């Protein structure tokens, strides 16, 4: 194998592919990137058997070939090279990287030890804009559970409906549901559970543009193609909880709250609240919302802001972090908070935007 390309481009490609490498594996091949020559580019692939990422780098190919190289080592070497052309050559299991007066030889692995990415057909696929998918991920992924003993809840449910795509995440204390209108041509609309890690890495690849992301789904795998990068992930097996039954359909109180001011005050109150299970107490009286937090070891916090209220006064407590997570990504000037009783779940929605619902369980006030 002999090729040359921009050091910057090759380093960037290795950085992208390396995101599929979760950590130090006992099998060196799972810590490696497969480099393959093709007509006018290098194809870089990393795959840890759960998540795989493949991208290409423009290159001049002199001699075709392939070799698996340690991802971290190759990235560290390239990051220290000057920003000029790098020559790549391989013989047997050694890969040589030469840039100006620097010359490094790294020990690689046989390419036939590298497991290829799963082949996922496009017969069950759809397209969505990068900006729309990025917002959907950011507005749901934070609600997924981090408890690995409940594997199903560590993922994000992807639901395909009538001209609609929906993402759902829950850790049982809160639920985030985000939908978007998308033309769907496939008749197979079975829901699937995408691992949080895959969604997190995908969100790093997509941009806030109208360019498309192509999503293809198989029985146990899902594929995303964006900006010339392919991300493949294994799906989580199992039955996702019936999330629709926990979304209240009625309310007795409705608050209209300015998002930025509310977020600022919750963040400030959380400085004290984090010493008392992150509890902040919301009290509604007339058109004033007060926030209080108290810790015997730290002190007290008090905030107030003007709101628009429908219904009677109420006192209810929430986890401050769970409020902050939603308010940080809602993206509108105001939110609606729909309430019934102090120990019943609350529903929060953006003002002036359809398709986003956040359900939050309250905490005991005392």
Locate each region found by the language model.
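Structural preference for solvent-exposed beta-strand-turn elements
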Residues: 1-366
């Amino acid at each position: 194998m002999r090729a040359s390309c921009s050091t910057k481009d090759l380093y960037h490609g290795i950085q992208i592919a390396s995101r599929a490498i979760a950590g130090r594996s006992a099998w060196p091949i799972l810590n490696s990137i497969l480099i393959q020559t093709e007509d006018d580019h290098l194809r870089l692939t990393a795959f840890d058997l759960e998540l795989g990422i493949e991208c290409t780098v423009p290159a001049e190919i002199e001699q075709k070939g392939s070799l698996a190289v340690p991802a971290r080592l190759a990235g560290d070497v390239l990051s220290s090279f000057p920003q000029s052309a790098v020559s790549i050559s391989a013989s047997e299991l050694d890969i040589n990287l030469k840039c100006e007066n620097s010359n490094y030889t790294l020990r690689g692995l046989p390419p036939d030890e590298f497991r290829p990415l799963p082949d996922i057909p496009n017969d069950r696929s759809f397209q969505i804009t990068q900006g729309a998918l990025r917002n959907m991920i950011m507005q749901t992924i934070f609600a997924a559970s981090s408890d690995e003993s409940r594997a199903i809840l560590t993922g994000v449910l992807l639901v395909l409906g009538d001209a609609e795509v929906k993402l759902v995440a829950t850790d049982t204390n809160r639920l985030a549901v985000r939908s978007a209108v998308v033309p769907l041509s496939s008749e197979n609309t079975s829901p699937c559970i995408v691992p949080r890690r895959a969604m997190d890495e995908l969100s790093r690849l997509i941009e806030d543009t109208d360019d498309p992301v192509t999503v293809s789904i198989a029985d146990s795998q899902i594929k995303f193609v964006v900006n010339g990068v392919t991300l493949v992930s294994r799906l989580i097996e199992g039955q996702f909880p019936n999330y629709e039954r926990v979304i209240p359909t009625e309310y007795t109180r409705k608050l209209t709250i300015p998002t930025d001011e509310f977020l600022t005050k919750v963040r400030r109150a959380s400085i004290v609240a984090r010493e008392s299970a992150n509890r902040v107490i919301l009290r509604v009286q007339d058109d004033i919302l007060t926030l209080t937090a108290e810790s015997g070891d730290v002190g007290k916090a008090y905030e107030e802001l003007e709101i628009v209220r429908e219904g009677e006064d109420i006192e209810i407590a929430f986890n401050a972090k769970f409020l902050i997570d939603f308010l940080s990504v809602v993206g509108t000037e105001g939110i609606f908070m729909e309430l019934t009783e102090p120990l019943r779940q609350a529903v929060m929605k953006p003002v002036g935007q359809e398709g986003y619902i956040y359900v939050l369980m309250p905490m005991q006030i005392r």
